[in-house]
């Protein structure tokens, strides 16, 4: 099979990378007032340049900035939206792992103004990335519009600003459409919408939580699909857009479980993206049967390599699982990646940077073995 020249690529990765110790120390120093914002930026720039080289040396056709300038994959973007303010207190999201539970506690949000883009979000970050890649396509990740809604729901809206939820949905889609156009003008040709909500909704416990706050949990995924479609319908012709779905990724822990069955038919047949990055590293993700709904022309990037644990997968096992997936969607529509990012938040998952590099190299080598150069 021929080498793909348009994203997503046969060997790809979700986006975030483990933060180097020097960068973590600089963030702590900045928070404590020991260094300036310019000092922190200089460290970020140097470490991002190194991360880009690492990705290109591994053989990847795309490169991100590792999300090194962010505290988390989604909240930095959401806080930067016009109309969104940090509210007193913190959200508490329970994550699970083999040892028990931990909590992710970002600042709560309040929507107290009309949702809009004031300044292009991550513009400087993308411009730096684009200017430093040499062989790879610069890839930018942003949270899906659904993430603005999922955690808080209608309760986070000021009713004086949004007495009608439909106006909120319309403004949210328009803001994202504006951001997509702005990023396109900066030269972005590979944009990814990261979305845990569409994966979480496969879990009955998550749907019960949504129903408990008075929303239609059985149809919310349809609203979310339409929100993304509205945001990307006028995307630049040169821009490939993917979405990444997972069930939570914080310090090697997760939130939800369950296959893609509940959302699969609508998700794969209606969501107008170019490709789907799907978590598939263990039994929590279910089987490949939902892939039967993937139409011709859409790529599925199988997240078979775990980013939660350090153990390196067997190339033979990865090939076998790709062959299993190919029973439901043609092999030519498949690709390979990690199951999620390596560091969705600044804390990162429980593996080393050398182990991260080995996993990226494994993805590249295995994809080359399966699909050729």
Task: Describe the function of each predicted region.
Residues 1-373:
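Domain-level signal for soluble alpha/beta catalytic cores
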